[in-house]
């Protein structure tokens, strides 16, 4: 009887260890579907100009679609000057939950810049973090930036 209990406990322990090790090595897979939804976001950082860094902040709302497009709007302040901007672009997400957003930004219908962001999607796609990799003005001038964004899914 004692031998059967010991053997049963040994088998249960082995199965539990195997199951836990299988679960811990399985990684979540992401895709564009991970991000589909509406997010609220904040952006903070600086634009680097010859006279020194200029602070940038923004809050907004952005929608990610199943077709890999993004659109939304934000209110931003650059050095204390505010504007309401419209965003439109594309996004892609890799299986390791990193990705890219390329967004054109418009004020009163006029293109004011195109930004490329590197992203990471966390908490099963409920949150995202991003850093601006490149910002290009309509005349092809590259604007140096140190800007990050945090987004939370609204629905």
Residue ranges, per PLM feature:
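Bacterial N-terminal signal peptides that target proteins for export
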Residues: 1-12
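C-terminal segment of classical bacterial N-terminal signal peptides
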Residues: 15-25
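Mature soluble binding/inhibitory domains
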Residues: 25-155
């Amino acid at each position: 009887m004692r031998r059967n209990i010991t053997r049963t406990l040994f088998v249960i322990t082995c199965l539990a260890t195997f199951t836990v090790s299988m679960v811990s090595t399985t990684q979540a897979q992401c895709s564009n579907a991970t991000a589909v939804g509406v997010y609220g976001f904040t952006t903070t950082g600086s634009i680097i100009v010859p006279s020194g860094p200029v602070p940038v902040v923004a809050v907004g709302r952005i929608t990610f679609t199943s077709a890999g497009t993004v659109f939304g709007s934000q209110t931003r302040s650059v050095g204390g000057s505010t504007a309401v901007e419209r965003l439109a672009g594309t996004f892609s997400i890799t299986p390791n939950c990193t990705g890219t957003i390329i967004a054109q930004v418009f004020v009163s219908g006029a293109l004011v810049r195109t930004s490329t962001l590197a992203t990471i999607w966390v908490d099963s796609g409920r949150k995202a973090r991003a850093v601006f990799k490149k910002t290009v003005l309509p005349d092809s001038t590259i604007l140096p930036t140190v800007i990050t964004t945090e987004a939370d899914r609204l629905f």
